[in-house]
């Protein structure tokens, strides 16, 4: 099929991208740093659930969102990312952006960070790929610790605050279930409840992941804030899943295995995904 001149021109000025969620297959909190942040060691993995972002060049910046409760002002990471790209490159690039928000907020799935990374990628594409992926990764760390991860290929061991990214070979494709309770959790509040006086036997390197996979040091503090989360986890484990783990600072859990999700729970299925070099993420066909 041949494209018309108008279609070709329009494709140069607009782009539509998938913005994937992430889960933490393990998350170790090593300690609190002098700057007030926490030193982490975590295995990040992108999954096939996510948002959709549409970008179109225009003369002023605008952001709209399918979720009326999500702020679309300067506090939104999408606008922060666009303006960061403009300040770094000096380009007079303005965009009309629409966010089709499908991921729940305060779920530990990295939705906002993914949106920001996707925006940086889109800006670079619309500008003619004038900077490298490594530069985008470095810039992203200035506005969010989890943003650099999304410039890996989708599987990475992340350290520091999360911004130090060691890309890894893709893991085997795996079907999971994401279960999100009707409430979210504030990341700062979860970290505030960490108790370093209690000994923790979890290792903090990727090599030990095969020996003791799937742990999250933030679960205990999340359970202290919301005791019903522990009940939810135990219910999911008793339903037959091999693994049930909170992702990030919560409040969602990912489940692996052949269990059954209770009908009263809000849940959706997803799969591990990765991206190819010089391409952004896309969803995979459903696995059987």
From Swiss-Prot:
Protein's pathway: Isoprenoid biosynthesis; isopentenyl diphosphate biosynthesis via DXP pathway; isopentenyl diphosphate from 1-deoxy-D-xylulose 5-phosphate: step 3/6
Catalytic reactions on record: 4-CDP-2-C-methyl-D-erythritol + ATP = 4-CDP-2-C-methyl-D-erythritol 2-phosphate + ADP + H(+)
Residues reported in the UniProt entry to bind ATP: 104-114
One GO MF term: ATP binding
Main function: Catalyzes the phosphorylation of the position 2 hydroxy group of 4-diphosphocytidyl-2C-methyl-D-erythritol.
Family designation: Belongs to the GHMP kinase family. IspE subfamily.
Record-given protein name: 4-diphosphocytidyl-2-C-methyl-D-erythritol kinase
């Amino acid at each position: 099929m041949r494209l018309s001149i108008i279609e070709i021109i329009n494709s140069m000025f607009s782009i539509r991208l998938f913005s994937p969620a992430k889960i933490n297959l393990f998350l170790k909190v090593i300690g609190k740093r002098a700057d007030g942040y926490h030193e982490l060691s975590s295995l990040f993995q992108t999954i096939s659930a996510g948002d959709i972002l549409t970008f179109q060049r225009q003369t002023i910046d605008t952001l709209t969102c399918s979720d009326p409760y999500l702020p679309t002002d300067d506090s939104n990471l999408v606008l922060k990312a666009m303006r960061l790209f403009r300040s770094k490159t000096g380009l007079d690039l303005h965009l009309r952006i629409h966010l089709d928000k499908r991921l729940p907020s305060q779920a530990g799935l990295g939705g906002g960070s993914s949106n920001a990374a996707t925006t940086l990628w889109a800006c670079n594409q619309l500008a003619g790929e004038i900077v490298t992926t490594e530069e985008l990764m470095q810039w992203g760390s200035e506005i969010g610790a989890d943003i650099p991860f999304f410039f890996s290929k989708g599987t990475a061991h992340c350290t520091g605050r999360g911004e130090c990214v060691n890309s890894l070979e893709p893991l085997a494709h795996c079907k999971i279930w994401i279960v999100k309770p009707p409430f979210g959790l504030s990341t700062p509040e979860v970290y505030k409840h960490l108790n370093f006086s209690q000994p923790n036997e979890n290792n903090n390197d990727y090599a030990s992941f095969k020996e003791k996979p799937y742990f999250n040091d933030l679960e205990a503090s999340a359970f202290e804030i919301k005791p019903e989360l522990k009940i939810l986890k135990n219910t999911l484990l008793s339903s037959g899943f091999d693994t049930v783990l909170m992702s990030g600072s919560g409040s969602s859990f990912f489940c692996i295995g052949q269990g059954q999700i209770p009908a009263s729970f809000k849940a959706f299925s997803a799969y591990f995904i990765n991206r190819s070099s010089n391409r952004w993420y896309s969803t995979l066909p459903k696995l059987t």
